């Protein structure tokens, strides 16, 4: 029988910009690449952080790269790689941000901030997920990268956010299976449709698509005359989602075919099913260190650099 697992708190994580406040910064850069002028590392870094704070992503990248160029062996240079990646991410330059993260990982694999680099890569893939009617290659990449974060750093805030996003990615993949399954069912390829709906139940059972997948199995099995299978899936739907609209439809469909459903649907306003309660939690809830700011897209910033 279908089991409903405990949902995780939905969190949207704030960014942490590791930077000193700016004192006497240079004026706004006019060109995408800075003209070489030797400057103190603290000034370059803090100016880059200031540009980032103002939303001038490309200028921020220029200053952080200048830190690396002028002071390649300093602690600031290491920090600047991740800040460059963060600025690229904020500017929607995901391929560049992934490249920055990979560079940091290759240079400093044992550094505590490597966890942020892995997280940044995962979030960049996550941001590139497309709708369910298109190829899901980016979705699969995001899922693999997010799982990597959880596996490597299970007790971190990065893993907490990654787990939430894994749930969202699974919902996306389930949606793709459902779209294909509906198409098969509509075009008379019932067995192929059943395979898609069963995949949702077996691989993505905690997603929002599970009730419909069970209903579609009832519908498909009735189409090919497998009444007992239809009744069994209807019972699973009823026991797990008695108040869901898909069970109301399944209940009616089974009755219309002379099959007595095992569970009565809940009345309107009755207690919601477990999955519905999980999915209704506020996904905009914020978890951040004291005094930190919220940032675009809920990215967790580079802690511990």
Curated annotation (Swiss-Prot):
Covalent lipidation (S-diacylglycerol cysteine) residues? 25
Q: Which domain of life is it from?
A: Bacteria
Keywords from the UniProt entry: Cell outer membrane, Lipoprotein, Membrane, Palmitate, Repeat, Signal, TPR repeat
An individual GO BP term: Gram-negative-bacterium-type cell outer membrane assembly
Q: Where are the TPR repeats?
A: 41-74, 78-111, 113-136, 174-207
Lipid-substituted positions (N-palmitoyl cysteine): 25
Mode of membrane association: Lipid-anchor
As given in the record, the signal peptide range reads 1-24
InterPro entries per the UniProt record, alphabetical: BamD, BamD-like, TPR-like_helical_dom_sf, TPR_rpt
**Family per similarity comment:** Belongs to the BamD family.
Per the entry, what this protein does is: Part of the outer membrane protein assembly complex, which is involved in assembly and insertion of beta-barrel proteins into the outer membrane.
Q: What protein name applies here?
A: Outer membrane protein assembly factor BamD
Q: What is the species of this protein?
A: Caulobacter vibrioides (strain ATCC 19089 / CIP 103742 / CB 15) (Caulobacter crescentus)
- Gene encoding it? bamD
């Amino acid at each position: 029988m279908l089991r409903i697992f405990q949902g995780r708190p939905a969190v949207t994580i704030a960014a942490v910009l590791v930077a000193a406040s700016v004192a006497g910064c240079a004026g706004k850069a006019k060109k995408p690449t800075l003209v070489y002028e030797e400057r103190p590392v603290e000034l370059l870094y803090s100016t880059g952080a200031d540009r980032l704070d103002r939303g001038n992503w490309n200028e921020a990248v220029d200053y952080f790269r200048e830190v690396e160029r002028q002071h390649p062996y300093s602690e600031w240079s290491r920090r600047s790689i991740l800040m460059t990646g963060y600025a690229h991410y904020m500017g929607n330059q995901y391929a560049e941000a992934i490249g920055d993260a990979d560079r940091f990982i290759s240079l400093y694999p044992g550094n505590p901030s490597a966890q942020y680099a892995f997280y940044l890569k995962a979030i960049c893939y996550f941001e590139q997920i497309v709708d369910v009617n298109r190829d899901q290659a980016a979705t699969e990449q995001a899922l693999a990268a997010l799982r990597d974060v959880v596996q490597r750093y299970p007790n971190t805030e990065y893993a907490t956010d990654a787990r939430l996003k894994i749930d969202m990615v699974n919902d996306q993949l389930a949606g793709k299976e459902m779209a294909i399954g509906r198409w098969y069912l509509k075009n008379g390829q019932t067995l192929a449709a059943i395979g898609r709906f069963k995949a949702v139940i077996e691989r993505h059972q905690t997603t929002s698509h599970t009730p419909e997948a069970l209903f579609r199995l009832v519908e498909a099995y009735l189409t090919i005359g497998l009444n007992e299978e239809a009744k069994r899936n209807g019972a699973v739907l009823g026991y797990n989602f008695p108040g869901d609209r898909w069970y109301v439809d399944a209940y009616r469909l089974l009755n219309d075919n002379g099959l007595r459903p095992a569970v009565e649907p809940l009345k309107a306003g009755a207690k919601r099913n477990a999955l519905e309660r999980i999915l209704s939690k506020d996904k905009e809830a914020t978890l951040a260190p004291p005094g930190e700011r919220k940032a675009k897209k809920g990215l967790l910033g580079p802690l511990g650099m």
